[in-house]
Amino acid sequence: MVAERTRKAAASGSRGPGELGAPGPGTVALAEQCARLPSPGCCGLLALALCSLALSLLAHFRTAELQARVLRLEAERGEQQMEKAILGRVNQLLDEKWKFYSRRRREAPKMSPGCNCPPGPPGPTGRPGLPGDKGAIGMPGRVGIKGQPGEKGAPGDAGMSIVGPRGPPGQPGTRGFPGFPGPIGLDGRPGHPGPKGEMGLVGPRGQPGPQGQKGEKGQCGEYPHREYPGGMLAALRSNPIMSLKLLPLLNSVRLAPPPVIKRRTFQGEQSQTGIQGPPGPPGPPGPSGPLGHPGLPGPIGPPGLPGPPGPKGDPGIQGYHGRKGERGMPGMPGKHGAKGVPGIAVAGMKGEPGTPGTKGEKGAAGSPGLLGQKGEKGDAGNAIGGGRGEPGPPGLPGPPGPKGEAGVDGQAGPPGQQGDKGQPGAAGEQGPSGPKGAKGEPGKGEMVDYNGSINEALQEIRTLALMGPPGLPGQTGPPGPPGTPGQRGEIGLPGPPGHDGDKGPRGKPGDMGPAGPQGPPGKDGPPGMKGEVGPPGSPGEKGETGQAGPQGLDGPTGEKGEPGDEGRPGATGLPGPIGLPGFTGEKGEAGEKGDPGAEVPGPPGPEGPPGPPGLQGFPGPKGEAGLEGSKGEKGSQGEKGDRGPLGLPGASGLDGRPGPPGTPGPIGVPGPAGPKGERGSKGDPGMTGPTGAAGLPGLHGPPGDKGNRGERGKKGSRGPKGDKGDQGAPGLDAPCPLGEDGLPVQGCWNK
């Protein structure tokens, strides 16, 4: 207490003895400075923002440095690699051009000094030479035209899933909540006419009709002792219109047994005037009998006995699994339940801990309120909180929902395994023979053939005799320039047709074609016999959980329970935060003026020790209401108190949510067969199934008949150059060898 007063005195400045001063400027400045300081949360956010900015700048600088290093390295390496690639390509092109344009060097034939023979005739065509070495890789060609898309390949193997292999199919779930009935569907197609029903009972006799007009005079009847059917037939034959009208009646008279016929008069239709018949013979006058009255209708017969039971039908086909029902609509709000019987006071089950609530935003500071008077101590409350009620029994299963829509087509099945490798095919046909090779080089022979011309031979001998001996062979001259390409030769005569080749092996079976168009629907067949009731189908898949229905109406408020026993006092709470200091009290009255002291200024003495605390003064007047203190921080949670006594049962709670659907009950006894239903309308055609896998290759069939002669083949490409010809026969002596033009070789003239 003393320390607090001392601190207040030091903060507010020195005051005179017995006076109350106003708050000093130091207190106000300190309060304003404390209010302006940022909160710890704001400081933390500011520090986090600065750290993020620094990390972003560091990452940016490091990325720029790394990018510059990569560009510099690419510039150094790129020049060397490009230089090597360009030089290698240039050398390759030069080698190709040099090989193409350079002439083959021909070696001079080794001849003795005394050989003066001209070249012999060309030898026979040599054999085709071996294929040359593989040339270098040519320049990449231009991008070709985009080809047509190929045929669709076989489905690939099933890919590996990242999640894992596909598990086995799950068990069918429990039955879902019944959905609301769907909208009214469109009118279906008109059904086929049903079978003809049984003949109904005889109806009651109708009212007598109005009296008809008098009919025309009929024809003269026959004698009564003649047969009735014969006369009737004669009359019908004479009048065809009457025969058409009375033919059903005549048939019923013929087919009916005699005891069943009852004499009854019918009011017939007005007949047409018949054809005048021939005059009959005069008959004896018959007795004119009185006309009888129409008889009364007979009594209604008893109803017929029920027919024997029909034959037992064939057993029905196993039913398909029911389709998954659509998601049900939210349920309607339940009716207001009646008040329940008060339960027994039993300890309720411990509730599950609730989810922690989100921290609320800081509220605005409120205006300072007036200091209220101290309230009286309240009475101890009664523990009347009821325990949690027991869950209600599960509801009855709802009616089955409407039929769901057709499901989406399933995924395509896994591809089939790869088939076995086929047998090797037969050897192919022999290819066409190549064209004739080019003319070979002149042989080393020394014999000249002049095709039997003696004059030319003698002239050549004279020319050779005048020439001198051959000189020494000169040096090999440089290769001449490449000659101009010769003209294209004439098209040769067509060769003889080749022999027919053997028939090739049978080709592999083609892929299965696409499914054909859907055919027109067939006629409806006659209705089959009714079969037995098939076994009950397996339970369908669990439907999707319906949306939760709206909350039901609040039930009536229960009667107020009796007050419970007095609860135990709770644990002492934590002390509250210290409030702000109150306003300074009013200034007291001035004291009496003291006697003037002696004005002898002495030296200031040292500060003396604090004196003993004085007596506690009288309480001052009640100050004004202080400012409302700020809301203190949330205190730590206290220890859990002891369990209170059992309270009275609470009011009846709201109806709980519907329980989970119960397990399906056992299959009931099959009921009696119901009446035969009408024939349903024909269903829509199903979707076209996927194309099946290619079938196995068929067996090797018998060899087919010999085919017709094929068309004449095209001329083949030019074959390779032939080998060098054989050495020719020895010819006449010549001083100088002759060239291709028939003249001596240059440098070997006889001057």
Curated annotation (Swiss-Prot):
Protein's cellular compartments: Cell membrane; Postsynaptic cell membrane
Region (Triple-helical region 2 (COL2)), start-end ranges: 274-445
Region span, Triple-helical region 1 (COL1): 120-223
Residue ranges of the region described as Nonhelical region 3 (NC3): 446-467
Biased composition (Basic and acidic residues): 214-225, 438-447, 499-509, 557-568, 586-596, 630-643, 706-726
Transmembrane residue ranges: 41-59
Compositionally biased tracts (Pro residues): 116-125, 278-288, 296-312, 391-402, 470-484, 601-613, 658-673
Superkingdom of this protein's organism: Eukaryota
Location of region: Nonhelical region 2 (NC2): 224-273
Glycosylation sites: N451
Triple-helical region 3 (COL3): annotated span: 468-733
Region (Nonhelical region 1 (NC1)): 1-119
Sequence ranges on the Cytoplasmic membrane side: 1-40
Pfam families: Collagen (PF01391)
GO cellular component: cell-cell junction; collagen trimer; collagen-containing extracellular matrix; postsynaptic membrane
Residue ranges with Low complexity bias: 204-213, 403-436, 615-628, 684-699
Extracellular side: 60-751
Record InterPro entries: Collagen (IPR008160), Collagen_Structural_Proteins (IPR050938)
Topology term for the membrane: Single-pass type II membrane protein
Region described as Nonhelical region 4 (NC4): spans on this chain: 734-751
The protein's assembly and partners: Homotrimer; disulfide-linked. Nucleation of the type XIII collagen triple helix is likely to occur at the N-terminal region with triple helix formation proceeding from the N- to the C-terminus. Interacts with FN1, perlecan/HSPG2 and NID2.
Stated role: Involved in cell-matrix and cell-cell adhesion interactions that are required for normal development. May participate in the linkage between muscle fiber and basement membrane. May play a role in endochondral ossification of bone and branching morphogenesis of lung. Binds heparin. At neuromuscular junctions, may play a role in acetylcholine receptor clustering.
Name of the molecule in the record: Collagen alpha-1(XIII) chain
Organism, as annotated: Mus musculus (Mouse)
